[in-house]
Amino acid sequence: MFQINCLNPISKVGLDRLTADYKVIDNMNDAEGVLVRSASMHELDLPENLLAVARAGAGVNNIPLDKCAEKGIVVFNTPGANANGVKELVIAGMLLAARDVVGGIEWVKASKDNADIAKAAEKEKKKFAGTEVMGKKLGVIGLGAIGVKVANTAVSLGMEVYGYDPYVSVNAAWNLSRSVKHVMNVEEIYADCDYITIHVPLLDSTKGMINKEAISKMKDGVVLLNFARDLLANEADVLEALKSGKVARYVSDFPNPTTAGQPGCIVIPHLGASTEESEDNCAKMAVEEMMDYLENGNIRNSVNYPACDMGVCSQAGRIAIFHKNITNMLNQFTAVIGEKNINISDMTNRSRGEVAYTMLDIESAATQDLVEALQKIDGVFRVRVVK
């Protein structure tokens, strides 16, 4: 039986996918698998028996990926499971920036005791007038699951949409509307677009990408939307641009003291994926990925190990080896197994950066002696008997 610990409340729809072979427990130290949403794991001691961490969501900056990789702990996420929920809020944010609905609502609240509020509204409403998005230019930076949905929806709203992503996947490209203009240089988006929305992961190369230099290349009165990661924007630079009028509105899903309550900022309390549907979808996907890995050793949607799928093992045994991505590892594995007079019926080796993952189906059950011999090979992080 596999024991699973939840560091955050996880949707019952997802947990209901667990079979009788699984038990949800309160103590992470006894768990083979961990399900997490936003809880930080950076300061946690990871138990030796922990095999997998599944993030019910896309972002994994709350998980120590390198530390997990070195311990042979596979970290999964759920890309695309919350894409529609985030997309809808991005579109809502864009509409709120185009027309001062928030300001109008606040005026109504402040005027609640005015018996002639309807008459007063006719005089005051011009203060909250805005523009329509139809015919405007939207730049989408990052054409992953969310970016593609935002771009396609904006096309249906009658916007002229430009997309930038030098690493766009084949699947994303197939799903992208033909009406979206794919640009090869992000500065084309900066120069031409009325609205710019960013949908990229937080990396060293993307941190603070929306800064003073980037903003200087944008159209006057541009609207910036950030529903991806808070640190993608240098918000001090954004506030300076708001004061000068270079940026008309900054819409963010990440509340913090820098932008909260600032003129021109529409700050939402991190509601992007906070829908029942998104939480259910993320939980189901996270649970299914973890189950396939724990039961079969297959890796799908990992952020620290390569994808690998050998289906269900039909042989007597299956071994998974986590190791450095260096030469001569496979030769050493097969030599050790051969010395034990065990035949290998199938084998898969995949690498990702500095780490690699090898699965071997063998015609005899794996012995403790075999596991220890493989573990002694220099460069091996972990040896796991899957079956």
Regions found by a protein language model. Name each.
Residues H42-L44, P166-A260, S274:
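Rossmann-like adenosine-cofactor binding region
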Residues G147-V148:
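N-terminal Rossmann-fold NAD(P) dinucleotide-binding loop
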Residues P79-K137, N301-V303:
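Phosphate-binding beta-alpha-beta segment of Rossmann-like dinucleotide-binding domains, i.e.
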